[in-house]
């Protein structure tokens, strides 16, 4: 293994065909790496839902223009191939609505609270200990994680960009 001091310049290397970005975030080095790689004709694989929610349409355009693949299946629903299913399996169908549980942490917390009668903070702490919640679960709890996922899925399903202000977001951090 070799340590790369400047990951953005790594995308310019002739002997690199595919960049896998797992840094996360939409306004940091991850953004620079992905944009640079696509513009330099490199295929990109990312699990970065924040980046795809904010810049997905622009990144898809750059990828198409440079005849490279932009793969982001892991950015929504982890191991469930929902993006590929929508893009390939349901392409002939008209999608009118999207329903689903888009955040596993929220699902675990609410389900456990209902089943056990325990309070939010106790269940959240248990979720952290079990690895179901991040050490800083703010994006899960305030709804921004689910909003990013619905923005990505809506963009694909309805073939248009959905602005953040059109997505009603309500977190669970104040629930009892």
Stretches found by the model and what they are:
Residues 3, 44, 69-70, 134:
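Hydrophobic beta-strand scaffold residues
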Residues 23-40, 47-88:
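Rossmann-fold NAD(P)-binding glycine/threonine-rich loop
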Residues 95-106, 168:
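NAD(P)-dependent dehydrogenases' Rossmann-like dinucleotide-binding region
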Residues 3, 52, 56, 79, ...:
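Generic structural signal for well-ordered, non-membrane alpha-helical segments
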Residues 122-176:
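Substrate-binding/catalytic subdomain of NAD(P)-dependent oxidoreductase enzymes
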Residues 82-95, 106-121, 148-162:
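Oxidoreductase and adenylate-handling cofactor-binding alpha/beta cores
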Residues 1-27:
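A structured beta-alpha segment of the ubiquitous adenosine-cofactor-binding alpha/beta core
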